[in-house]
UniProtKB/Swiss-Prot annotation:
The gene is flp-19. The keyword Transit peptide does not apply. The keyword Signal applies. This is FMRFamide-like neuropeptides 19. It is found in: Secreted. It comes from Caenorhabditis elegans.
Amino acid sequence: MSFQLTLFSMLFLLIAVVVGQPIQSQNGDLKMQAVQDNSPLNMEAFNDDSALYDYLEQSDPSLKSMEKRWANQVRFGKRASWASSVRFG
């Protein structure tokens, strides 16, 4: 009885280890895989690319001033809520 229980638990452990293995892709680079599939897999693959943010700032230089103006309106202007007026005075 004890031998059968040990054998059963070893078999169960082996199945759990095999099923629980993460799926390994042949190509570990997500960028390469996304280019080959011609579809973005996950944005984590492209997070290290700062060219997109540089492009946005260069294409519209008023973007930063517009963001700053919007933030001031949210804090002190017509979009200010009761909580922001309490917080910022």
